[in-house]
């Protein structure tokens, strides 16, 4: 049997990584959601692990749905898929729900905690630190208060989501400066918009753009 020399990329995110379809509430086909696009663009030399969960958070524990907290599951996920060459983190939108009343700075701190946890855990378990690509999520649209998710979000979720990019970029920069570990940053909101259907989830064309951009960023490093 030939050894598997492919680079392993773990995509850790929420419903927009899962591939939630705002048109029917189901899941996009593998070739439509952005990790699938990433797989197509990068080609055979890469193994793409899709770890998207609807409602996943980066800094809070959802009431009655603690399993959606992305922090406790992170180490088990990493251990299941190691060795890992790169991790793509795109989280934060669900932390802006009304039940948390969170400031964007809290979300950036959650992302920073995840970056440190990934680096320290995989250094211990596989003897190397993966490249971490922090992707600030697409903004939440102004129409969120009249969308199917209006009960979950306040009107100020939209402007708060617009503050994430600069905070996440600083978090990634600080991590790189402090640890000298490899990492990158991508602002999804500069490339794509959420659907007009629910002001939160992505349409197929946005998945195509995002997956291609992430592939280009990863290819430059890996």
Q: Whereabouts are the PLM-identified features?
A:
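N-terminal start-of-chain detector that recognizes signal peptides
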Residues: 20-22, 58-62, 104-108, 151-152
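Catalytic metal-binding/acid-base residues of hydrolase active sites
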Residues: 16-17, 54, 94, 138
């Amino acid at each position: 049997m030939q050894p598997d020399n492919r680079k392993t990329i773990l995509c850790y995110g929420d419903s927009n990584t899962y591939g939630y379809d705002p048109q029917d509430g189901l899941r996009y086909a593998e070739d439509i959601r952005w990790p699938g696009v990433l797989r197509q663009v990068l080609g055979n030399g890469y193994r793409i692990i899709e770890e998207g969960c609807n409602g996943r958070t980066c800094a809070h524990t959802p009431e009655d749905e603690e399993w959606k907290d992305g922090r406790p599951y992170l180490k088990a996920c990493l251990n299941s898929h190691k060795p890992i060459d790169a991790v793509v983190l795109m989280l934060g939108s669900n932390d802006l729900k009304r039940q948390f009343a969170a400031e964007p700075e809290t979300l950036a701190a959650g992302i920073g905690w995840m970056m440190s946890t990934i680096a320290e855990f995989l250094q211990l378990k596989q003897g190397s630190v993966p490249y971490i690509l922090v992707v600030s999520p697409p903004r939440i649209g102004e129409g969120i208060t009249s969308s199917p998710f209006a009960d979950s979000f306040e009107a100020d979720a939209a402007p708060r989501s617009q503050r994430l990019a600069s905070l996440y970029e600083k978090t990634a920069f600080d991590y790189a400066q402090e640890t000298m570990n490899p990492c990158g940053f991508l602002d999804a909101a500069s490339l794509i918009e959420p659907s007009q259907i629910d002001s939160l989830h992505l349409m197929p064309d946005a998945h195509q753009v995002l997956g291609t951009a992430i592939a280009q960023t990863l290819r430059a490093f890996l």
